[in-house]
Every structure is written in structure tokens, then in C-alpha cells.
Regions:
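Thiamine diphosphate
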Residues: 1-127, 134, 142, 338, ...
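Glycine-/acidic-rich phosphate or pyrophosphate-binding loops and their flanking alpha/beta elements
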Residues: 7-11, 232-254, 267
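A general structural motif
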Residues: 113-117, 226-242, 257-265, 285-292
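Conserved thiamine diphosphate
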Residues: 116-169
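Conformationally flexible catalytic loops at phosphate/diphosphate-handling active centers
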Residues: 161-246
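Generic long, charged, amphipathic alpha-helical segments
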Residues: 266-299
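Peripheral docking tails and interdomain loops at the edges
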Residues: 312-359
């Protein structure tokens, strides 16, 4: 299949369309504005719906409603905009409504800046809206990987009835890369496969079988039963949907943990360190929830590994999960920046060299 040079944000939008998304609700915010811009042109071409909402709060609640009919729905925003969506995201999770949410992370906290960041890891993986819920959360490291993950995102969302979150730093959205676009999925809502969906009532239907999309349970026992069902589903996701990349880990003296674009920079550092005679590996979570604890532990706790370096474009958020995975078996160091200052290859090389010298 031929390669096409595409900007990340536009490629992500096109992949969603090819995966069957026919409803986009969003609001412009840098650095993801090209996603709604692209959708505004493409959705009418394929008979879909593009709606620029009056706010992020309105957009996520439109997602809630449209996804409740069984349609494949998507919204996108960036850090402070995603913060505004958190109430609606919790509603979608509580009602078990499948949808795809894109967060093109930018610098923070507050309004921060419009450059790339990985500062929303806690929000996407640990926090967000209220209640005990999770989102299946992907952290792509390239435009092609974002496309490939999008092509499975709706299938996963519908299998488990869980919203899917993409944590894509601003560089992924703004860079251009040659990509291979998949064929268009012929998706139609099948009420037999989605008995929970509100697909409308017609004369002759059994009123007792009406669809109700709901996240409120006034009765305590009913809420407890619902939460037990959610937790059972999350355990199934943890058991089946962990994704990661292990790179050059066999025989490594040091292991780097990183996600997203930072992991690509780490690979450049690994190549330079190899020229200096130092064997360094990389473990990159592709799903940051569920986090691949066992895979990280296996790579980092090899007998020959002297220490682990976690590198992030924040002040050390995934670091907590890395430490939980390793559980004190190896020393874990951290290197990172916030304020959208991307860690460089030279900085990572220098950090590994200082660790080797015992500094």
C-alpha cells in the first residue's frame, strides 16, 4: 500500500473516519485544532456529522448522547479543554458508553502553553472525573502507531463498553510522517450486537425492553452491583489489553522507561550509548492503562540490569507506576522536564553516563 505524507492531527482524524466514526463533537484549542478543522471538511463528504460545540462541556455531553445510540463517536481537545470534559467522561464511563477521546497534551498547569507535554498522565490514568473508573488509554509514539491504534480503538471500546482515551503529546499531532492509511471499515449500528443502545422505539416493540443510558443509581445496592460489574470489566481489560514495546532489553546494563515521543528520543540515545560500549534497553508502555507492570518488571529486573532511568516530558508521573512495577528490586532514577522542554538525546546520554559513574 502506498505511503502518504500527513500531519499527525489530520492522520488521526482520517483514521477515526476509516474506523467508522461518523459523529465528531469538539471545540478548537491549540495544538489539536487541525483535528476539528479536518473533520469539518471530511464528515460532510462521507455523510457524517461535524458539530463545533459551544464549549468542551457541551461537546462531551453530545458525545455521551450520540454514543448512547450505538454510533461511533469521537471528540478531541487539549489539556485544559480535557479538564473541562472530565464530568462528561465520568458519565460516559459510568454509563458504559463506548467512545473515543483524543487529548493532544500541551504544557500546564492552568493554561500553560501550546507546546508539547506529557503532563496529563495522572489525569488520564489516575484521576479525571469522579468515581472508581478507568479509561482504556493509548499513548502512541508515532503518527503511524496512532493510526493503527485508532483502527482497533472502537472495537475495544465496544467489546468492553469502555471509553478509549488517546494521550498524544503535541509533537505527535503537529509532526508530519509518511503513513499507510487502512481501508474504510463498513460500520453500521447493529441492535442485535448492541442491545444496550438507544436505537429508537417503534409500534410493536416491547416497552419493557426500552434502552436506558444511565449513570445514576439512587439505591445503594444497585450502585454497588453496577460498580462490581465495572470492576469485573476492568479486570478483564487488564488481563487482555496490555500493550508495550521492549527494545534492546536483552543483556542491557540499564533500562530506560518512557512513553510517547520521548521514547523515540530515548532510542536515539540508546544508539549513541551503544557506540560508547554501553548496552541500554527501553521499555515503552503503549497502553498506559492498563499499565504493563509485569512486562516492565521483567525487563528491568534482569540480573544484569544495574539501574533504571525513567524519562518523561513532565516531572515524573509514569515514574510512580514504574516504581510500583519494580517494587524496589532495582534503583530507579528520573530525568525529565516540564514546561514543554523536550528531553534531548544528549541529556539522556549524559544522565546514563553519570549513573554509570555512580553520580
Amino acid at each position: 500500500m502506498a505511503l502518504t505524507l500527513m500531519k499527525g492531527s489530520e492522520a488521526i482524524a482520517e483514521a477515526a473516519i476509516r474506523a467508522g466514526a461518523r459523529f465528531f463533537f469538539g471545540y478548537h484549542i491549540t495544538p489539536q485544532t487541525e483535528i476539528p478543522e479536518y473533520m469539518s471538511a471530511r464528515m460532510p463528504e462521507i455523510g457524517g456529522c461535524f458539530l463545533q460545540a459551544e464549549s468542551e462541556v457541551a461537546a462531551i455531553n453530545m458525545v455521551y448522547g450520540a454514543a448512547g445510540t450505538g454510533a461511533r463517536v469521537i471528540t478531541s481537545s487539549s489539556s485544559p479543554g480535557v479538564s473541562l470534559k472530565q464530568e462528561g467522561i465520568s458519565y460516559c464511563a459510568g454509563a458504559m458508553v463506548p467512545a473515543v477521546i483524543i487529548n493532544v497534551m500541551r504544557g500546564g498547569p492552568g493554561l500553560g502553553n501550546i507546546q508539547a507535554s506529557q503532563g496529563d498522565y495522572f489525569q488520564g490514568v489516575k484521576g479525571g472525573g469522579n468515581g472508581d473508573y478507568h479509561l482504556l488509554t493509548f499513548a502512541p509514539a508515532s503518527v503511524q502507531e496512532a493510526i493503527d491504534l485508532m483502527m482497533i480503538a472502537y472495537d475495544k471500546a465496544e467489546k468492553y463498553r469502555i471509553p478509549v482515551l488517546f494521550l498524544a503529546d503535541g509533537i505527535i499531532a503537529q509532526m508530519m510522517e509518511p503513513v499507510e492509511l487502512p481501508e474504510m471499515v463498513d460500520y453500521k449500528v447493529d441492535p442485535e450486537k448492541k442491545p444496550w443502545a438507544c436505537t429508537g422505539w417503534k409500534p410493536g416493540d416491547d416497552p419493557a425492553k426500552r434502552g436506558i443510558i444511565n449513570s445514576i443509581y439512587i439505591d445503594t445496592e444497585s450502585l454497588a452491583v453496577h460498580n462490581d460489574e465495572l470492576q469485573a470489566m476492568y479486570k478483564e481489560v487488564v488481563a487482555n489489553e496490555q500493550m508495550w514495546e521492549s527494545y534492546n532489553c536483552e543483556g542491557a546494563e540499564y533500562i530506560i522507561t518512557a512513553f510517547g515521543t520521548v521514547a523515540r528520543i530515548a532510542k536515539s540515545a540508546i544508539a549513541e550509548l551503544k557506540e560508547k560500549g554501553i548496552n541500554v534497553g527501553l521499555v515503552r508502555p503503549i497502553t498506559v492503562w492498563p499499565f504493563p507492570y509485569d512486562a516492565v518488571r521483567e525487563a528491568c529486573c534482569q540480573p544484569g540490569v544495574k539501574a533504571v532511568l525513567d524519562v518523561e516530558l513532565n516531572e515524573g508521573q509514569m515514574l510512580e507506576d514504574v516504581k510500583l512495577a519494580i517494587n524496589g528490586a532495582k534503583h530507579v532514577d528520573f530525568f525529565g522536564h516540564c514546561g514543554s522542554q523536550m528531553p534531548s538525546t544528549d541529556e539522556i546520554v549524559t544522565k546514563i553516563l553519570s549513573m554509570k559513574e555512580g553520580k
